């Protein structure tokens, strides 16, 4: 029987360091904001347990039609992403509208079965308790080619014209959800132009409430299925006829995808069964299941790795000016066509795994199945398992990954890899065998991917670290 699992209660690795944010988000690239950006070296590492995303509750199961129904909303919530004792963070999360406790960042996992359809009513619930719309958590640049609700029906989904440099957009937030990796029909694909606003009571007159493809796809869906799209929502159906694989869902609204995902709108969608899947018992398990008791130990774990930055009050930090990228402070509009807020890329300074900064996973001397997702907006990851997170790069791995699958499902045969290279949105389905590691060994999942393509390098103390895996007795 396994002993009580403990976490590493280490503070800063390697002592005290000066604050040097990762990659292009360097100290000199954030003029005027360093006093409110949280120094990542002040965040204790490995004091928090790795969260395992639970399974999303369904609303109804139609056994005759072989359809699982879900009603999934998008809401604003506060969550402990930084370690206990530090401020909570306001984020957005998906969750079952019938289960208020299911809203989280990242989302609960949708478990799907080959040949059994999943129908989701996606509801935009970004409203306050009075029914008024919530503004975005992050700065929205209205000068891009984007959803542009304030442009009305005639100017939605365009790049609006301004006679002077505008401030950020603060109106109701458009959303639309895309199943990334799914074989989706057009009306259920989450087109960027099929967005919709929340059903708020204070949407200004003249605003477009839906994107230019919304009504078209609504008509197609309602004609094909007995399901109505209500205001502030869309209904999508996924046939689940493709190979068993690791997919994920995320927001996809035109011109704000980067912001909506950064705010928290992402979750796993795991398709099982069918001729391409493996028989039960071949791979490590169990995986999380609906109704699991708190603290249940699983041996198949979805793992999403994302980079984030925080303000000193715990809120998410995102650049408010183009100057954060290349020091360009204008002229913007009308002196040029350069957008004043948007950054071509942004590399944050803190690594977040399954919604927690630098967590620890306590493992037993056995095999684990880890389903990795690179959920970063711009960062490539090169993952290794090592015993010293501060070792000179390239570090020597102590354990290989046995990659068994990728975005499209299982590989023809397992591939032994000393490192995993993943681009944003890519998945890697791997087995890690801890049976040969002495009990009590501290292992670290590190990143050797650069903070910035071609010009930067990973920061060993911050963006170069993920989480450790201390070995327990069994």
Protein language model features and the residues they cover:
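Extended terminal and domain-junction accessory segments
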Residues: 10, 26-75, 82, 138-171, ...
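Solvent-exposed loop/turn segments at secondary-structure junctions
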Residues: 78-79, 126-128, 183-185, 254-258, ...
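Short Pro-Gly-centered flexible turn/kink motifs
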Residues: 118-120, 229-233, 422-432
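Histidine- and aromatic-rich segments of cupredoxin/plastocyanin-like copper-binding domains
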Residues: 184-209, 309, 320-474
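N-terminal, post-signal-peptide metal-ligating segments of extracellular/periplasmic oxidoreductases
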Residues: 4, 9-178, 183-202, 215, ...
């Amino acid at each position: 029987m396994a002993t009580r699992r403990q976490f590493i209660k280490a503070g800063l690795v390697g002592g005290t360091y000066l604050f040097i944010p990762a990659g292009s988000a360097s100290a000199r690239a954030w003029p005027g904001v360093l006093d409110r950006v949280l120094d990542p070296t002040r965040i204790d590492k490995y004091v928090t347990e790795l969260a395992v995303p639970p399974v999303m509750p369904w609303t109804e199961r139609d056994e005759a039609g072989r359809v699982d129904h879900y009603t999934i909303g998008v809401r604003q919530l506060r969550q402990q992403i930084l370690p206990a004792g530090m401020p909570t963070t306001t984020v957005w999360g998906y969750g079952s509208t019938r289960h208020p406790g299911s809203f989280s960042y990242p989302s609960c996992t949708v478990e799907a079965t080959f040949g059994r359809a999943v129908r989701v009513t996606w509801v935009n619930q970004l409203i306050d308790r009075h029914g008024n719309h919530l503004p975005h958590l992050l700065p929205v640049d209205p000068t891009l080619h984007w959803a542009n609700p304030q442009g009305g029906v005639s100017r939605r989904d365009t790049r609006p014209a301004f006679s002077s440099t505008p401030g950020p957009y603060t109106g109701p937030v458009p959303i639309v959800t895309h199943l990334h990796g799914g074989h989706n029909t057009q009306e259920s694909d989450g087109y960027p132009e099929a967005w919709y606003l929340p059903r708020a009571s204070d949407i200004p007159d003249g605003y477009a409430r839906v994107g230019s493809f919304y009504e078209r796809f609504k008509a197609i869906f309602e004609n094909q299925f007995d399901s109505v799209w209500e205001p502030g929502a869309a209904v999508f159906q996924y046939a689940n006829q493709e190979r068993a694989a690791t997919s994920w869902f995320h927001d996809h609204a035109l011109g704000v995808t980067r912001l909506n995902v950064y705010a928290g709108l992402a979750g796993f969608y795991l398709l099982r069964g069918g001729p391409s899947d493996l028989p039960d018992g071949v791979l490590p398990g169990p995986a999380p299941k609906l109704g699991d008791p708190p603290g249940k130990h699983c041996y198949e774990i979805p793992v999403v790795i994302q980079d984030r930055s925080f303000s000193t009050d715990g809120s998410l930090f995102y650049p408010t000016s183009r100057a954060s990228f290349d020091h360009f402070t204008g002229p913007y509009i009308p002196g040029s066509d350069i957008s004043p807020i948007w950054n071509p890329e942004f590399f944050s300074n803190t690594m977040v795994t399954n919604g927690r900064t630098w967590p620890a996973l306590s493992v037993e001397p056995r095999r684990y199945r880890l389903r990795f997702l690179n959920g970063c907006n711009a960062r490539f990851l090169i993952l290794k398992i090592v015993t010293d997170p501060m070792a000179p790069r390239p570090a020597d791995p102590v354990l290989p990954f046995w990659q068994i699958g990728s975005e499209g499902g299982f590989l023809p045969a397992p591939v032994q890899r000393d490192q995993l290279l993943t681009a944003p949105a890519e998945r890697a389905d791997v087995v890690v065998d801890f049976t040969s590691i002495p009990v009590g060994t501290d292992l670290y999942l590190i990143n050797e991917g650069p903070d910035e393509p071609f010009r930067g390098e990973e920061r060993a103390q911050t963006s170069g670290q993920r989480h450790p895996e201390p070995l327990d007795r069994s």
